[in-house]
UniProtKB/Swiss-Prot annotation:
Top-rank lineage group of the source organism: Bacteria
PANTHER family, alphabetized: GLUTAMATE RACEMASE
InterPro entries named in the record: Asp/Glu/hydantoin_racemase, Asp/Glu_race, Asp/Glu_racemase_AS_1, Glu_race
The protein's name: Glutamate racemase
Length: 263
């Protein structure tokens, strides 16, 4: 087992979208030793059965938690969070933080209508409709499910130019209909500037990143920051496409080159 004097935080996702969550946590807790694991072998998670998804996430997270003496786990994926949290919390003796679409804060900000931009799996899941019923029942809610937006975010992190015309076509059903839009997938804050440009500055964009960062900070409030900081480690379950370009972006965030971590 490897250990260090720094608190070890594992951030888990099916792709690189969870890096938007990492960035928010890192703003508050730059002294933490970060491990990022993405299960790109099974990407996208929205196409997996619940049983397969649960088995994969549980196996990977438990293994890495034990190997690297992890102190806290963040499941930085909306799809996985709706399925795996109870099982992981029962198995692990450490805090496990999940993400949910920020429908409640969006509803409080909205005057007339809330938009939820998410993956098709999140848009159709009962859990999401329960959130809408509980926290946004007095508002009109527009739902937009897009897998292509996830791919665009993955491409952007590899240095590809975002096609604003394509983005405008995808987001067209949301334009002029809502005053607050929820970025309901952790990939989407990576496209926040481009989405804002398409929807217009009058639309407020809300995501879960800051709330997750506050939660992690409160759970790790007894940290003792160290003056020296080592490069953080990032793992994938299969070789990523355009790995060299992706490693370039990851280096600017403080990560070492991607290491293979098969299931």
């Amino acid at each position: 087992m490897e250990s260090s004097n720094q608190p070890n935080v594992l951030i888990f996702d099916s792709g690189v979208g969870g890096l938007s969550v990492f960035q928010e946590i890192n703003k508050r807790l730059p002294e933490v030793n970060y491990y990022y694991l993405f299960d790109n072998q099974a990407y996208p998670y929205g196409e997996l059965s619940q049983e397969t998804l649960l088995a994969r996430v549980e196996a990977l997270v438990v293994k890495m938690t034990q190997q690297f003496a992890i102190d806290l786990v963040v499941i930085a994926c909306n799809t996985a969070s709706t399925i795996v949290l109870p099982a992981l919390r029962a198995k692990l003796p450490i805090p496990v933080v999940g993400v949910v679409p920020a429908i409640k804060p969006a509803s409080l900000l909205a005057n007339r209508a809330v938009g939820l931009i998410a993956t098709p799996a999140t848009v159709t899941r009962q859990y999401t409709h329960d959130l809408i019923r509980d926290f946004a029942h007095e508002k009109e809610v527009e739902l937009l499910g897009s897998t292509r937006l996830v791919d665009i975010a993955e491409e952007k992190l590899r240095g590809r130019q975002v096609d604003q015309q394509e983005l405008a076509m995808i987001l067209k059903p949301m334009k002029h209909k809502v005053d607050v839009a929820v970025l309901g997938c952790t990939h989407f804050p990576l496209l926040k500037e481009e989405i804002q440009q398409v929807l217009g500055d009058e639309i407020i964009l809300v995501d879960s990143g800051e709330a997750i960062a506050r939660r992690v900070q409160s759970l790790l409030h007894q940290l003792s920051p160290q003056s020296t900081k080592t490069p953080w480690r990032i793992f994938s379950t299969a070789q990523p496409w355009d790995e060299a370009a992706l490693n370039g972006s990851l280096k600017t965030m403080g990560f070492n080159a991607i290491e293979l971590y098969p299931l």
